[in-house]
Amino acid sequence: MGILLSICRRRHDPLTDVEGQPINVREEFEMFEEGDEATEACVFLNPNMGTDEYDEEDEGGDGGEGREPQPEVKTTPYPKRKKIKLKADVL
């Protein structure tokens, strides 16, 4: 938030919201408290949707590296080509 405040002080044009109204960054910064976000309750739009607890298995089995396991690729050997006999006398 402090970065926004310093950027907005250097700007000549005021910041505007979606409706085009100017935003007073100094007032917004003073109203902001770091504890506000931690005390807000989660609002679920769909009450039928359950909340899943975090599980280490959700990482894809890679030990938390964030990669999905790659499927094993089975390949077949290339067919052997027949040797072509060249006629040396033909030009």
Curated annotation (Swiss-Prot):
<feature type="compositionally biased region" description="Acidic residues">
    <location>
        <begin position="52"/>
        <end position="62"/>
    </location>
</feature>
<protein>
    <recommendedName>
        <fullName>Cytoplasmic envelopment protein 3</fullName>
    </recommendedName>
</protein>
<keyword id="KW-1032">Host cell membrane</keyword>
<keyword id="KW-0920">Virion tegument</keyword>
<dbReference type="GO" id="GO:0019033">
    <property type="term" value="C:viral tegument"/>
</dbReference>
<comment type="function">
    <text>Plays an important role in the cytoplasmic envelopment of tegument proteins and capsids during the assembly and egress processes. Also participates in viral entry at the fusion step probably by regulating the core fusion machinery.</text>
</comment>
<keyword id="KW-1043">Host membrane</keyword>
<comment type="similarity">
    <text>Belongs to the herpesviridae cytoplasmic envelopment protein 3 family.</text>
</comment>
<dbReference type="GO" id="GO:0055036">
    <property type="term" value="C:virion membrane"/>
</dbReference>
<dbReference type="InterPro" id="IPR024360">
    <property type="entry name" value="Herpesvirus_CEP3"/>
</dbReference>
<feature type="lipid moiety-binding region" description="N-myristoyl glycine; by host">
    <location>
        <position position="2"/>
    </location>
</feature>
<dbReference type="GO" id="GO:0046760">
    <property type="term" value="P:viral budding from Golgi membrane"/>
</dbReference>
<dbReference type="GO" id="GO:0016020">
    <property type="term" value="C:membrane"/>
</dbReference>
<keyword id="KW-0519">Myristate</keyword>
<feature type="region of interest" description="Disordered">
    <location>
        <begin position="48"/>
        <end position="81"/>
    </location>
</feature>
<dbReference type="GO" id="GO:0044178">
    <property type="term" value="C:host cell Golgi membrane"/>
</dbReference>
<keyword id="KW-0946">Virion</keyword>
<keyword id="KW-0449">Lipoprotein</keyword>
<dbReference type="Pfam" id="PF10813">
    <property type="entry name" value="Herpesvir_UL11"/>
</dbReference>
<keyword id="KW-1040">Host Golgi apparatus</keyword>
<keyword id="KW-0597">Phosphoprotein</keyword>
<keyword id="KW-0564">Palmitate</keyword>
<keyword id="KW-0472">Membrane</keyword>
<comment type="subunit">
    <text>Interacts with cytoplasmic envelopment protein 2; this interaction is essential for the proper localization of each protein to the assembly complex and thus for the production of infectious virus.</text>
</comment>
<dbReference type="GO" id="GO:0020002">
    <property type="term" value="C:host cell plasma membrane"/>
</dbReference>
